[in-house]
Structures are given as C-alpha cells and as structure tokens.
Amino acid sequence: MSDKLVWIDAQGSWNGAKEKVTGALESGANAVLVSPENVERVRELGKMTVAAAEGNPDIRVIGIGSEGDGTLFLPHDLNSSEDMATAKALKAQGTTTAAYVRLAGKEYEQFAARMGKLCDYLIIEGDDWKVIPLENLIAELGGSGTKILAKARDIDEASVALQTLEKGADGVLVDVDDPLKVREIARAVSTKQAGLGLTPVTITAVRDAGTGDRVCIDTCSLMTPGEGMLIGNQSSGLFLVQSEAEESPYVASRPFRVNAGAVHEYVLVGEKTRYLSELASGDPALIVTRDGDARKATIGRVKIERRPLLYVEAETGDRKISAILQNAETIKLVAADGSSTPVTALKPGDRVLAKLEKEARHFGMKIEETIVEK
C-alpha cells in the first residue's frame, strides 16, 4: 500500500487561482502549482508546499513556458537542452525541482526520462492520458527516487490513476477549473489508500488479562460503524478494532475515537506499524473499513488510562494472532459478516476480521527475516 501525492494546478491570475488554492488547503493536497507572481499570496493563505516556474517557491518547476511543454523547440541533441542545463544548475545549488513534460511524441518521452534523472519530481501530461507510456519512464527512473505525477483533468482520470498506476506513478496533478471539483478530487485522492486484504479469523480464546495501561486514539475524523483501526500484539496479524461510532445505552457514541488497546500493541499507519504508546497529537493515523478500504486521518489526542484488560486470541490455518483490549462493552471487533461484536461478548468460534502478513517487521517496516512473536 502506498500514499498518492496530490498536487493542484492553480496557475493563472490570482482571481481564478485563489479558490483552487483554498480548496487545496482545505482538502489535504500535498502541493499547489501556481504562477510565479502568486507564490507569496499562497503563503499568506496558509502553510502549503508551493511549486512554480520562477520566483522563490518550495519546488522549482522546469519546463513550463519552455521546452518541456513545447513552448520552445526541443533540440534533437538533448545535451543541448536549456531545460536540462537549468535542472543541472539548480540541482548543484540544492534546489528541490520538478520537471514538467508534455508527452507530444517519443522524443518527449526520452526527454522526460532524462529530466526525471535530474529532478526530484516529474510531472507528465499527455493528450490521451490513458496511453501515457508510464512503463517506459518507470523503468528508466526505477531506483532514482524521482516521484512521478500524472496530470488528471477530472475525477475519472484521477480514479484511474489510483487504480492503474498503483505500482508506478506516485500521484496526480489535478487540473480542473471548478473549485468544488478541486476539493472533491483532492479529498478522494489524498485520503484514500490502496485496498487492504482483510481475512476472517476464528476466535480461540478470550480471557481476563488483569489491569494495565490502554490507549484511546481520538482522531480529527468521524468514523461510521464498520470502520476502525488495525491493532494487535503481532505486527503480522492485526484485528480490525471498530471505532466507538455506535450508540450505547451506557455512554454516548464517540465516532472520532478508537479504544485501541494496551500500550505495547501495534497499530498500522500507512505502510508501517507503530506502538500505541508512541502516538501523539498531530501524528497520522489510518482508518480502515470492513471492506478493507482505507483513508488517512490525523490524531487529535491520545489518552492513556489504567483499565481492566482482556486477552483475545484467534487463528486461521496454522497461524495464531492475539490482542489485549480493554474489558468493556463499547470496545468491538468487526465480525466476518461486517457486523460488530463487543469484546465482552466474544466466544470461541466467533469469526472476526484481521489483516495478516507473511513478513515480520523491524522498526515498523516489513522485512524478510525469521521473527517469532508470541
């Protein structure tokens, strides 16, 4: 699973660009591409990475109004390219750069590959987006560290980018005129993650685990029944612990909260796990649905309190996984049929959802090594 970058194309007059920039800020976009005269105006609106062809942006874009977009003639001998010379000079200065290339032919594909090796980002535009020769560029730039972004002009193109470019392109540059569409596309791309494969596992044991410190994660997002976080004692086996989105006769619902379990446990955050005890306000979180879809969120508060605990164990095939959760009826696991089951009502034979992995983890990252966690 990998995050996708979202840049918003807000070039042009400030009157037209301001609403797009505001939409980018409000929807969690990673960066905004603006005309040079608007760089400081963006910074006055809010904190966001700014890209532009000139001036003092965070990311200097090479190719707009020059060879990259076809404004200037692209020489047959690419060693004579003015854009390449600019990229080399800026790289020597330590400037963060992005190459912008409109793929108008095979020669521009070759040019994009050369520019991509010189720049931190490569933005590619095509007349027919769906036939951009990404495979060739990815092969050329593999291992270079360059982030590839494809230009998307509507939500359908952005959706295709998320699905078909999953192994290659790192994101999209959203180019739409309607500020409402900017928000819609940016939110869809910036929050949605690649689908996670959840597996039904069978409960084999539920028993008292004494008293200990447990963690509540209060996010800046609202969750619905069937949504929660992936948590467990072993990084290779994580239960889907539901948020407190459902009403209870004992306490009001708190749809922003996941009562996650004991402080030592793992929680999946993006492509790695973290210990619950490490989490703090402002950290990223990952909200997962019963269908395995995932979206990013931000932690607003973490509460650690001493509470009674339950040990929950499950198995599938020859694998066993476990978690230690608070002993309370408001803490629920998501069942295999999509419903929820309070941990206080769990019994051997119940089927719940979990994420299983073959790889172990070291410092939260997947590794191929023999690690036994009991």
From Swiss-Prot:
One of its GO terms (biological process) is amino acid biosynthetic process. Its EC number is 1.4.1.24. It catalyses: 2-amino-2,3,7-trideoxy-D-lyxo-hept-6-ulosonate + NAD(+) + H2O = 3-dehydroquinate + NH4(+) + NADH + H(+). The keyword ATP-binding does not apply. Keywords: Amino-acid biosynthesis, Aromatic amino acid biosynthesis, NAD, Oxidoreductase. It is an enzyme of class 1 (oxidoreductase). The keyword tRNA-binding does not apply. InterPro entries: DHQ_synth (IPR002812). GO terms for molecular function: 3-dehydroquinate synthase activity; dehydroquinate synthase activity; NAD binding. Catalyzes the oxidative deamination and cyclization of 2-amino-3,7-dideoxy-D-threo-hept-6-ulosonic acid (ADH) to yield 3-dehydroquinate (DHQ), which is fed into the canonical shikimic pathway of aromatic amino acid biosynthesis. Belongs to the archaeal-type DHQ synthase family. This is 3-dehydroquinate synthase. It comes from Methanocella arvoryzae (strain DSM 22066 / NBRC 105507 / MRE50). The gene is aroB'.
